[in-house]
Every structure is written in C-alpha cells, then in structure tokens.
Amino acid sequence: MSKRRVVVTGLGMLSPVGNTVESTWKALLAGQSGISLIDHFDTSAYATKFAGLVKDFNCEDIISRKEQRKMDAFIQYGIVAGVQAMQDSGLEITEENATRIGAAIGSGIGGLGLIEENHTSLMNGGPRKISPFFVPSTIVNMVAGHLTIMYGLRGPSISIATACTSGVHNIGHAARIIAYGDADVMVAGGAEKASTPLGVGGFGAARALSTRNDNPQAASRPWDKERDGFVLGDGAGMLVLEEYEHAKKRGAKIYAELVGFGMSSDAYHMTSPPENGAGAALAMANALRDAGIEASQIGYVNAHGTSTPAGDKAEAQAVKTIFGEAASRVLVSSTKSMTGHLLGAAGAVESIYSILALRDQAVPPTINLDNPDEGCDLDFVPHEARQVSGMEYTLCNSFGFGGTNGSLIFKKI
C-alpha cells in the first residue's frame, strides 16, 4: 500500500514567549526567556515558585465568557491555537469536504486546574457543589472535540495522552491517518496548563523541578553542569496537516513536508531513561527509516532537552549513537531553555520550531548553557541563534514518563 505525502499548511501557537507563532519565533531567535514567578496562586510554601506562563491571554473574540467557564485553561489555549492554525491554512470547510477533515490533539495531564477547583467544592460543600460541566471541562480529548464542533469537522477525532510525548504522537498519528487515506486534512497538536498548585506541587514532590528561585530565567539550562531540574511551561501548538495533492490543488501555502515518524519504549523506568539513551535512539532510527534518509542529512535536532540531570545526558548519547561521525556536525538545541517544558504541548510547539527553522534557515539557541556537563559535547547552539544554509531536514524529539518516545522529521519543500 503506497502512502500519500503529508504537508504542513497551517500553524498556531500560544507559548510563554508569545501568543502567536511569529511572536514566539522572533523571541526564540533573540534568545529571550519566558520564565517568570508564578502570580496566580500563593507559592510561599512551594520549593519552586516560577514557571513558563502564558501572558496577557484573552480569548473573548473566539470563546464567550459563558463558554470559558465550561473549559479548563488548557482547552482554551488549544482552541485559540487551533483557530490560529485553521485561519493560517486558508482552508474552507464545506459540506462536501467536512467528512475528510479531522483532529488529533492531546494533553499530558488535562484539566488539572478545574479538577482541583471541583475537588475543593466537593470537600467544602458536598457533591451538589460539583459543576455539571466538570467532566467535559477537564478531559483530554475536549480540545479536539470543541474544534470539530466549531468547524463542523466530521473526520476522525482522536486524542493521544502519552505524557510529554503527546504532542509528537498526535501529530505523527494524524499524518498516518492522512497517509493511509482516512482523511485529507487533520488539525494536530497538544495543549497544556499544568502550572497549578497540584501540578507544581506534584512535580516538586518528585524533585523534578528546578528550584532556582533567585534567578528563574536562568533555571532551564539543558546540558549545563548546574542544571537542577526542568521548568514547567504552559501553552499549545497546532498544525494543519494536509495531503500534498489536496494542498496543491487548492493553492495552499506549504511550510514543510512531514516525512518521518518514529516511536519506541525504554522498558526501563517509570520516570528516568537508561543512561545510553537506547529508547530515544530507537525512536530517531525509526523516524529516519520512515523518512528513507540517513542521519547525516538532518541539519537540526530540536531536542527534548528538559534540563534534568539524567535526561539530558541520555539524549546526548542517543544523538551520538544515531548520528555517528555526523554527530559533531549536526546542530542540536533545546528551546525549553527559553519556554520551559510544555509537557503534552511540548512536541507540538517544538515541531513548529523545527518547521520554522527550515523556512528561515535559522536555528534557535540553547540559552543558559555556560558550562557543558561531561559527555554533553555536541553543538548545542549556545546562547545565540545560528543562521545556516542548505538545510533540508529537521528532527524533533519528545520523550515522556513511562518511557514513551517519539521523533518527527520535517523536510523543506
């Protein structure tokens, strides 16, 4: 069975450094950090008091105040990013094509904020105080649900929740839905709002978060000797994926082609990768096989790079394993150094960065990388963005708790 080609024709995003794709990209190329002190709840008892927050968010032109009360913030973020992507694509929905257009949008955690609020209502006032909208306001698949309802999309609607790999997995599976003929267009990505009391407290209890409260903007420092954990980030990233001939026929703007998708499992530990990065290497190898290219053809790797002691070293080793002699030449950076870790949305926003790197032939930096750790000796594009030429392929990595891994490869077109 021959697969159909899949291209990217629309992009949408909310991030800690910008509320649009272009404002975010401009900030990243300038090396700007979006990490700040948490101001929406009292953090005095918390070991970590900062995160990558979405700022100046207003969605009233898209979602009424009445409807906002029925949605956790992650759903609102996802809808706004989805609308941006749909508008960017210029796609017209008709009665004829609606059955061939769907959505694949996930979240690592879902509506944690409203889960907390409704639990408080339950404890204070009993079950009658729980909102009747509690369940649909918090479950993971509701970004896809709302967007299909808003646009009348009657194709596949799915939501994959695989922790921090959710964004990549939804995009990859959406591409396969198109490639194997079950849809012509898919809105795909991820959304997250985990900077809540329970989210910050839970990751803090696991000692996964940085506690650099005296200098939050320097807290996310992938591959640096002084890294002490990741930084939570909020936001959403959405891509419109489209079958190539369908996109050409309507004269769509094409950002890139999605040519490779690879997955694997560590089968090692609940939250830590093996030191040799074998699972990450396998995901990259599978993506390269799917794309039909050699590792040496990749110009840039947008790394998972979370700023954790174990994860950063394992990924560096995985890149060395897969790229071999080419490892010293490939550019590898972690945009999480500026945005923090958007969990289930990370792979989605970072796929967009990988696509824009192809468009502009520019690679965003890894900021805060002052003293690379032992074994972390790749070209991590420290401090400043890098202009390149002739870059044809980029690779985006995402790895999650439970040992789930995913890689995507994009091609300039």
UniProtKB/Swiss-Prot annotation:
Q: Which InterPro entries match?
A: 3-oxoacyl-ACP_synth-2, Beta-ketoacyl_synthase, Ketoacyl_synth_AS, Ketoacyl_synth_C, Ketoacyl_synth_N, PKS_Beta-ketoAc_synthase_dom, Thiolase-like
Residues binding platensimycin: 271, 304, 308-310, 341
Tell me yes or no: is Transferase among this UniProt entry's keywords. Answer: yes
Do you know which Pfam families this protein is assigned to? ketoacyl-synt, Ketoacyl-synt_C
The residues the record assigns to binding platencin are: 271, 308-310, 341
Q: Which residues form the active site?
A: 164, 304, 341
Q: How does it assemble?
A: Homodimer.
Q: What is this protein called?
A: 3-oxoacyl-[acyl-carrier-protein] synthase 2
